[in-house]
């Protein structure tokens, strides 16, 4: 039996609201998004719809002792994504060397480098019969290349094991925020592996970085995305994510979208922050489905993104295959 890949949890995402359109990139306020009263709104309560593919994958994962972020994070979209034969894997170990206020993944000293992990992930992708695989990773500032080899080798292993399977990677910045030369050298390893989609999540506006993402820098993050666009093959799509509900203003959300577009990003996901525990960042507000639709309208129609996936339950890998298709980055076999 294949040794199981052991991922932990996925990042939780989120969204906000805005004001009347007078210029490109301005968002209409469609509903009241005042601070929440502690109760979860009805639109965040979903019904499980289990199709044949979902049942098949559930049985296979249990029989083979496999593991995915989808299960570990109790992602609400698992039924839909597995029905489309899409899943997400976390590589690089269980401990992250950075701490973000919204994230479930624990911070600590990482375990030793596991060079066999890429092969095991690829074997899992093959056994699950996936059409599209998303590979994310913890930050590994303890490694000279920030874990870039691990990401690149996972891409290569999946390509070899499952020809035609779409591959999207969501790594850290490989230390670019502190050492640009080393970060770009590491990034080039992933460039050479040619993922279909390269994602790096900015998550929140500049003002909130010191509080929410103290180990990252907003402007360096935008530079890193631009560097990825400049270095990656033209066919590779560049992607990012915004979490709203963490204290940002509506104008700041639109500003992030503008900045992302100006730095070569083609795909963006926007979803609701759901506070994992009392120890995590305080939830500021819930945003309605109508307001999420307005973010999508502004992003696609006014700012020119290839695809904006925006909704209360959206996570960064939600409908990842469809986004890749819309950006012309991947064609299903």
Positions of PLM-derived features:
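Auxiliary Fe-S-binding modules of radical SAM enzymes
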Residues: 1-87, 119, 123-126, 153-164, ...
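Local cysteine-cluster metal-coordination motifs and their immediate loop/turn environment
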Residues: 67-81, 92-107
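Active-site mouth loops of central-metabolism enzymes
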Residues: 91, 102-115, 168, 172-182, ...
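Conserved alpha-helical substructure of the radical SAM core
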Residues: 107-134
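Structural motif
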Residues: 124, 138, 168-172
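Hydrophobic residues within beta-strands of alpha/beta enzymes
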Residues: 133-135, 167, 198-200, 268, ...
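Conserved radical SAM core fold
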Residues: 134-144, 174-177, 196-218, 237-239, ...
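Short acidic active-site motifs
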Residues: 185-186, 208
């Amino acid at each position: 039996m294949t040794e199981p890949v052991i991922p932990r949890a996925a990042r939780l995402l989120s969204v906000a609201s805005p004001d009347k359109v007078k210029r490109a990139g301005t968002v209409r306020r469609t509903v009241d998004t005042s601070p929440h009263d502690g109760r979860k709104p009805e639109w965040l309560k979903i019904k499980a719809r289990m199709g044949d593919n979902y049942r098949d994958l559930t049985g296979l994962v249990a029989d083979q002792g496999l593991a995915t972020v989808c299960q570990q994070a109790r992602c609400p979209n698992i039924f839909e994504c597995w029905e489309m034969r899409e899943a997400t894997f976390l590589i690089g170990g269980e401990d992250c060397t950075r701490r973000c206020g919204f994230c479930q993944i624990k911070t600590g000293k990482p375990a030793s480098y596991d060079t066999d992990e890429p092969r095991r992930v690829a074997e899992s992708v093959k056994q699950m019969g996936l059409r599209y695989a998303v590979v994310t990773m913890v930050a590994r500032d303890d490694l000279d290349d920030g874990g870039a080899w691990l990401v690149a080798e996972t891409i290569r292993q999946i390509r070899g094991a499952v020809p035609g399977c779409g591959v999207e990677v969501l790594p850290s910045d490989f230390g670019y925020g502190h050492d640009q030369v080393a970060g770009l050298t590491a990034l080039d390893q992933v460039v050479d592996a040619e993922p279909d989609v390269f994602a790096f999540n900015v998550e929140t506006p500049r003002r909130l970085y010191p509080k929410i993402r103290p180990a990252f820098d907003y402007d360096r993050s935008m530079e890193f995305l631009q560097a990825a666009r400049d270095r990656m093959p033209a066919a590779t799509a560049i992607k990012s994510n915004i979490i709203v509900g963490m204290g940002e203003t509506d104008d700041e959300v639109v500003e992030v979208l503008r900045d992302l577009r100006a730095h070569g990003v083609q795909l963006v996901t926007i979803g609701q922050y759901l506070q994992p525990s009392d120890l995590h960042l305080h939830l500021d507000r819930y945003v309605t489905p109508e307001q999420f639709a307005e973010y999508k309208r502004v992003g696609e129609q006014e700012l020119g993104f290839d695809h904006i996936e925006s909704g209360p339950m959206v996570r960064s890998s939600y409908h990842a295959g469809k986004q890749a298709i819309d950006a012309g980055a991947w064609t299903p076999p």
